[in-house]
Design a protein with these regions (language model features):
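Multi-pass alpha-helical transmembrane bundles in non-GPCR membrane proteins
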Residues: 2-220
Length: 220
């Protein structure tokens, strides 16, 4: 039986009255033991990606990378790790909604392995706006669930704030990559070095805040 958000909002949640939640990872917000199991899974993901990050950082240090560039590489990897966590929770929630009897953890593990085996290199993290994609993905798939779960306006307000952060992140990314499209002066390569440095930092700031906002919304 599919989850009925209206009935849930009217009657509140109790395991006996809503047995369809029993096989879904979506009940992790109500059952600490399942939340703990998911935490362990996420810790394993962070450990996997952290090893990759340290390996890349050591390579850059050995090649004499400047400290500011090393900072941006670190931020890139933090974005990728956060993206994996968001996609893991999001895919698990979607699987629990569509096929309640399916072990959504299997899909989550496949998502982690699929992303990890692609290398998660600097090229991936800089060319693919992972945080923005994850924020849009999560906002779309989780909005009804989050808003109806608590039956208050906080979920809606948080979604609005996250959406604004996503828009700001997208604008900063456009400013960093395509300054000419916004009427700014560019060199022969189509770049504006002065604008690109701080616009890139703003992109990381806004996209990271959007992801963290949504992560707090999902787990509250």
């Amino acid at each position: 039986m599919l989850w009925n958000p209206t009935r849930f909002c009217e009657n509140g949640y109790t395991p006996n009255r809503h047995p369809e939640w029993a096989s879904a990872l979506s009940m992790l917000v109500f059952y600490p033991c399942i939340a703990r199991a998911l935490q362990l899974q996420l810790y394993a993901t962070v450990a996997l990606l952290g090893t990759n990050m340290l390996s890349s950082m050591s390579t850059h240090l050995s090649q004499g990378m400047a400290a500011d560039n090393l900072f941006f590489v670190t931020v890139d990897y933090i974005d990728v790790v956060t993206t994996v966590l968001i996609l893991t929770v999001g895919l698990a929630e979607i699987a629990a909604r569509i096929v309640p009897w399916l072990n959504a953890g299997i899909i989550a593990v496949l998502a982690i392995v699929g992303l990890a085996t692609q290398g998660l290199s600097d090229e991936l993290s800089t060319q693919w706006s992972g945080s923005v994609v994850a924020a849009l993905f999560t906002t779309t798939t989780m909005s009804v669930y989050v808003v109806c779960r608590r039956c208050d306006g906080r979920g809606t307000l948080t979604l609005v704030v996250a959406g604004m952060l996503v828009v700001l992140a997208a604008c900063a990314k456009l400013l960093a990559d395509e300054p000419g499209a916004l009427g700014l002066p560019v060199d022969e390569h189509g770049c504006n070095a002065h604008t690109a440095s701080w616009a890139h930092a703003l992109w990381h700031l806004f996209s990271g805040l959007a992801v963290l906002t949504l992560l707090g919304l999902i787990t509250r």
